Amino acid sequence: MELVKRGFLRACKNHSYLSFELIDDILAPLCANHKTTKPGSKEAIRALVAEINDTISDLGQLLVFIKYPVKAEEYLVYAKTDATPDSVANTGLTAEECQYFSKLLDKIASEEDCHIAWNDAYNDIVLQASSKPLKKSRMQELLQKWIQMGYFMEVTDRIYLGPRSLVELSFYLSSNHADNIKNCTLCKCLVLWDIRCGSCNIQYHRGCIQTYLQRRDICPSCGNLWTTPIRRSIG
């Protein structure tokens, strides 16, 4: 099983973020090659991930499950625990290209709903003290690379903060963009694009408030009766 764990960790690094469907596609041949029983449920996969985390936490790495409302998906994210906007994109890039990542991250995070139009990813982003302005074609290449790495997410014609940014850069985002990005008061983890109280507009993870409301029927923040439907609307 140790060989399976190592192979799966490599796959997590390569993909950056994985759906349960992709996890199954990776584990099926991996376990078959090593003649090991494949985890047969989400609970078994979570247990496998917990075992891997025990071996990599001291190395500044972490595998984290995160629910991502924009895509109505739960992803497993590979993250570095010491990451900052200045460090996540610096491998093989120029200073201007690294600065573009930081500026783009801040531009998206400063929006009320933390997403921008596709064209805005190239417009009105000023790189300080840059003697070599980035060409739009290079910006497009970098954005596609960072989308593949999970730092940003493309949905229709909008660019959102990606699942990896929400995990790896959560402290930076909640500290520097506190007006738009806050933690769920129930689990203390960052929450975006999720369910809000109809009275006070405080936002929670859908799963967190659903569990909370099994024992009481009021908002944990304002104390008023909870009226927002928990189930997602269809269409």
From Swiss-Prot:
GO cellular component terms, semicolon-separated: nucleus; Smc5-Smc6 complex
GO BP terms, alphabetized: DNA damage response; DNA repair; double-strand break repair via homologous recombination; protein ubiquitination
EC numbers: 2.3.2.27
Primary enzyme class: transferase
Molecular-function annotations in GO: ubiquitin protein ligase activity; ubiquitin-protein transferase activity; zinc ion binding
Domain of life: Eukaryota
InterPro entries in the cross-refs: Nse1, Nse1_RING_C4HC3-type, WH-like_DNA-bd_sf, Znf_RING/FYVE/PHD
Catalysis performed (reactions): S-ubiquitinyl-[E2 ubiquitin-conjugating enzyme]-L-cysteine + [acceptor protein]-L-lysine = [E2 ubiquitin-conjugating enzyme]-L-cysteine + N(6)-ubiquitinyl-[acceptor protein]-L-lysine
Annotated keywords: DNA damage, DNA recombination, DNA repair, Metal-binding, Nucleus, Phosphoprotein, Transferase, Ubl conjugation pathway, Zinc, Zinc-finger
Main location group: nucleus
Cystine pairs: none
Zinc finger (RING-type): 181-225
Record carries keyword DNA-binding: no
Record-linked SUPFAM superfamilies: RING/U-box
Gene3D superfamilies linked: Winged helix-like DNA-binding domain superfamily/Winged helix DNA-binding domain, Zinc/RING finger domain, C3HC4 (zinc finger)
Residues carrying Phosphothreonine: 185
PANTHER family: NON-SMC ELEMENT 1-RELATED (PTHR20973), NON-STRUCTURAL MAINTENANCE OF CHROMOSOMES ELEMENT 1 HOMOLOG (PTHR20973:SF0)
Subunit structure: Component of the Smc5-Smc6 complex which consists at least of Smc5, Smc6, Nse1, Nse2, Nse4 and MAGE. Nse1, Nse4 and MAGE probably form a subcomplex that bridges the head domains of the Smc5-Smc6 heterodimer. Interacts with MAGE and Nse4.
Family from the record: Belongs to the NSE1 family.
Role description: Component of the SMC5-SMC6 complex, a complex involved in repair of DNA double-strand breaks by homologous recombination. The complex may promote sister chromatid homologous recombination by recruiting the SMC1-SMC3 cohesin complex to double-strand breaks.
Protein name per the record: Non-structural maintenance of chromosomes element 1 homolog
Organism: Drosophila melanogaster
Protein's gene: Nse1
